[in-house]
Amino acid sequence: MDIAVPSVLHAGDFHVGGIHCGDSLRKVRSLYGSPTKYARSAHYTTMQYDGKDIAMRVRSRNDTADILKETGEEREGVRIGVESVFLTSGKDAVFGRGLRLKMPAEVLVRQMGIPSNVLRDADANIYYFVYENPARDGAMIFAVANRKIERVALMPPRPPYSRGEALPVQNKWSERDFTLMGFSLNQPFQANKYNMWNNLVKRDSNNFWLYGDYGVEVDRRNMVQKVFLLTNNAYTSRGAALGYHISTVLSLYGRPDRVEVGPEAEKSVDAYYYDSPFQKGVSLVFVVNHASRYVEDVLLISAPIQNLQDPMARYGLQS
């Protein structure tokens, strides 16, 4: 099993349109010319570019007294120069590792590796893929909607984007890795915690709450027993989704604990299991088309899948 190891991100990877944190406004002007709007306060200068080719806002920290630039025991020194860049349109603007707006989310994670955080705006159904630089003093935040990069920001890391935890690596886990759509297994279920449910299906003593992009199985004690993705507009905590090639999943998660290989048949599927070290019997499972190697299902389970080859049985929704 060949597993690509994401290369380490470097400070030079953290840029938007060639602008890095700490760059001068002179450099910004040399790249993009005079701004459409210009505003200066005591501490910051903001330049806005609004044209047919680009929409971008650059915020820079003005120069200040040398003593304020020094880092002391109880405070960080002020960093002058560009502090943040926000790009909302511009098909030719390159950022990160050769990325552009409208590129697929799968290309994003293949180029940038494992996100340090993935957040979801449940109301707008927008995901934010967060990458922090090795020094932990800068972050790139990619807004993903309809499976594509819609916006990107370069800014200092701060909550809720930065969690202050160790950056994730292959085969090293946090409890967050064994959640799906915000749900943990064997925890009390709250129906409208993130989204309004669309449909409720009963099977024996369990309820299946179906949302637009995912479903949740709940037992008679109102405890979550299974979570599964229904569309390719939903992502795991490491940015994986339906429709990804298995090589992308392996680059994000590393070597699985086990693989269940299906028969040699036209619609046969295999299952890649990642077992939680935090909850016995809990696994994150990627179901992959045996021939094409693309992900067909993602499930967080607490009991074995009874019939892997039957899509409805995988969910537990067989008649």
Model-predicted regions and their roles:
Residues 1-18, 161-187:
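N-terminal low-complexity, Pro/Thr/Ser-rich intrinsically disordered segments
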